[in-house]
Structure formats: structure tokens, C-alpha cells
Design a protein with these regions (language model features):
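Sec-dependent N-terminal signal peptides
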Residues: 3-12
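Sec/Tat signal peptide C-region and signal peptidase I cleavage site
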Residues: 12-18
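Amphipathic, charged alpha-helical segments and their helix-to-coil junctions
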Residues: 19-164
Length: 164
């Protein structure tokens, strides 16, 4: 009985050490995908468009500030209050536009990145299964690993996705 228990323990511990462990830099995979580069191009175009719209509002505001400053001394109180309200409203509009623009960019980024990340995760899973890996760790999350014992599958996943 003791011999059987010892043999079972040795076999169990051997099977634990036989696990195939890999690592991946998913960020490296994603940023090298053609889809990611296209998404970045779309995001940059959207950001440029939103920036141009914001600059238009800013120019309008600067013009009205200059007009206000030039005529402030000769304005009646009623006109001055009206102009100040107009400037405050324009400033509020600019701040609101900035906030909406940031939200729009974040939403678009999430919309574009979701299928890219899904595709990368599917490729990681396929390469992991094909390679017989039992565990894959994210490289950036590992504090220590023995490079001889943990294979980096990043190049294989990039090759599967056609990412340079």
C-alpha cells in the first residue's frame, strides 16, 4: 500500500511538471495587426475632424472676446451683460463639445478595437491548443519566469495573423 501510494505521488508530481507553459505579449500582437493600423488611421481622422470643429468654436470665441474688449468701455450695462452671457454660453458650448468629442473618440476606439482583440484572442487560443500548452501567461504580468521553461508564442501568433 505504501509503495502504491509512493508511485501514485511520483506519477502525479511528474504530470504536474509535464505541463507546457507559454507566454504572450498580446499588446505586441495587436499593434502589429493590419486591422489595428487601419483602426488607428480611422481614429486619427476622427480626432482631426473633431479638433477642427473645436478650433472653429475657439476662433469664434476669441473673435467675440476681442470685440467685447474693444467695445466694453462704451457699452451700456444691458449690452455688456448680454455680451458676457453670450461669451459664457460660448465657453460652455466649447467645454461641452470637448467632453462629447472625447466620449465619441472613446466609443469609436472601443467599437474598432473589440473585433481586433477578439481576433487576437482567438489566434492565441488556436496557437496555444495546437502547441499543446496548458497555460499561457501575459508577458507583462509575469514577475519572474525561466525562459528555458516558458516559451514565448508571440511570434507564432503574429505569424498566424499576418502581423509584422
Amino acid at each position: 500500500l505504501k509503495l502504491t501510494l509512493a508511485v501514485v505521488c511520483v506519477m502525479f508530481s511528474t504530470s504536474l511538471f509535464a505541463q507546457k507553459i507559454g507566454r504572450i505579449s498580446s499588446q505586441e500582437v495587436v499593434v502589429n495587426m493590419a486591422e489595428y493600423k487601419e483602426a488607428q488611421t480611422q481614429l486619427e481622422a476622427l480626432a482631426k475632424d473633431l479638433q477642427a470643429q473645436m478650433e472653429t468654436i475657439q476662433v469664434e470665441m476669441n473673435t467675440k472676446i476681442q470685440e467685447y474688449q474693444k467695445g466694453a468701455e462704451t457699452m451700456t450695462d444691458a449690452v455688456r451683460q448680454l455680451k458676457e452671457k453670450e461669451l459664457n454660453d460660448l465657453n460652455t458650448r466649447l467645454q461641452e463639445f470637448n467632453q462629447v468629442a472625447q466620449q465619441e473618440l472613446q466609443k469609436k476606439e472601443q467599437e474598432l478595437m473589440e473585433p481586433i482583440i477578439k481576433k487576437a484572442n482567438e489566434a492565441i487560443t488556436e496557437v496555444s491548443k495546437a502547441g499543446g500548452y496548458t497555460v499561457i501567461f501575459e508577458t507583462g504580468q509575469m514577475i519572474y519566469f525561466d525562459e528555458a521553461q516558458v516559451k514565448d508564442i508571440t511570434p507564432e501568433v503574429k505569424a498566424k495573423l499576418g502581423a509584422n
